[in-house]
Amino acid sequence: MKKASSQPRAIYYVVALQIWEYFSFYGMRALLILYLTNQLKYDDTHAYALFSAYCSLVYVTPILGGYLADKVLGNRMAVMLGAFLMAVGHLVLGASEIAPTFLYLSLAIIVCGYGLFKSNISCLLGELYQTEDPRRDGGFSLLYAAGNVGSIVAPIACGYVQEEYSWAMGFALAAIGMVAGLIIFLCGNRHFTHTKGVNKAALCARSFILPNWGWLLVLLTIAPLAIAVLFWQEWAVYALIVATAIGLAVLGKIYRQAENQKQRKELGLIVTLTFFSMLFWAFAQQGGSSISLYIDRFVNRHIFGYSVPTAMFQSVNAFAVMLCGVVLAWLIKESIGGNRSVRIWGKFALGLGLMSAGFSILTLSARWSAAYGHSSMPLMIAGLAVMGFAELFIDPVAMSQITRIEIPGVTGVLTGIYMLLSGAIANYLAGVIADRTSQSAFDASGAINYSINAYIDVFSEITWGALACVGLVLLIWLYQSLKFRNRPLAVGS
């Protein structure tokens, strides 16, 4: 007999697709900066610019992807189409080793696929439950854990295949993973018949000279080409400026629509959290760019005669997030009493403090490299693990606060704005920071020498920058704590 508490059968197909999507996305991401510098011979400045532009735009396109799913495609079709585009993009990226002109187009296709997939996979999962279904939270926890499994395995597998075979095979493995996830998902198609499908009436309705399905085909053709031009001409920053201006305008409109002081205070708290989260992720996203190149150039990666591929180090962060997340969920229970705002700022201070500690370890590693030529692998792993642990005190806290806001009908919009600023803008800032490590010179034989001092300076500055953020957050925390403590006295007087 089937237990009432068991999850719906369809969730396991969604989870399988999520695992393979994370495998595909993070497997490619672990290779990208190394591919640009080591294979295509981009200088660091050019590589950082393209890498940060790519990582920024993947947080912008989900806004359009969510709109298309709501109006025309439905979540299930949007997810399948997004998975297909990402698989195609990874295959084209592998071909760019032979024809570098495919590079910008492949990244653009992946960005479009990610936009259709990322904004709708969670919505599809939500469709599997009734509003008050007690299994809902467990389903989303399972989806989150599944993603971490994919992001742990991907850099190891893709890094190994790239090292042993070729760059094209590394990217092809990422594509194969996405195709495998899509096939598994399609095998469970019968379990999704109750979910929202394609809106055929909207798809066939005529707008101007074409039916909407015609406009959809035009969009799916033009969007990758337009994004490829943004990458090619390094115009992605202008797209970010436009998106940010729109996001801030919407935020201002929400603030004006707030009905009372409590709602405005809640919105102010979310804005402040978003600002500190943006800085946090500008520091944390060094992991895929400057830190990755530092490991490749200055860390002794040999163990028992085997050279550990640089891409594999990307798994450390994801493993730390998963392991520490399980431990925290077991050890920590949210207190019912006390001031929630005080607890929020305490967690943010801890997260930023751990980020500072992680970069202080990386600074020590870089100084070791300057003194002895190479740093040790355990020291590098320790720094990355601490940085991964720090993530648990930032995004979950901010997202929880957004879902609690009492202004009706704005949770989804605020989530999109949060992802725009803490994702897209933070990745752009991360590229600006990473570019400061791109100091190099040529020796007498014509070989390029990279400056370890540049890494020391940047890692040290991030350490102190994160620590300064901790100081600001602690001031806010202290103010909120004293304000809450004195409240009964004010009432009693």
From Swiss-Prot:
Coiled coil: none annotated. It comes from the Bacteria. One of its GO terms (molecular function) is peptide:proton symporter activity. Its main location: membrane. PROSITE patterns: MFS (PS50850), PTR2_1 (PS01022), PTR2_2 (PS01023). It is a multi-pass membrane protein. The chain crosses the membrane at residues 14-34, 49-69, 91-111, 138-158, 167-187, 212-232, 235-255, 267-287, 312-332, 344-364, 379-399, 413-433, 458-478. It is found in: Cell inner membrane. One of its GO terms (biological process) is protein transport. Keywords: Cell inner membrane, Cell membrane, Membrane, Peptide transport, Protein transport, Transmembrane, Transmembrane helix, Transport. Probable proton-dependent permease that transports dipeptides. Belongs to the major facilitator superfamily. Proton-dependent oligopeptide transporter (POT/PTR) (TC 2.A.17) family. DtpD subfamily. This is Dipeptide permease D. It comes from Citrobacter rodentium (strain ICC168). The gene is dtpD.
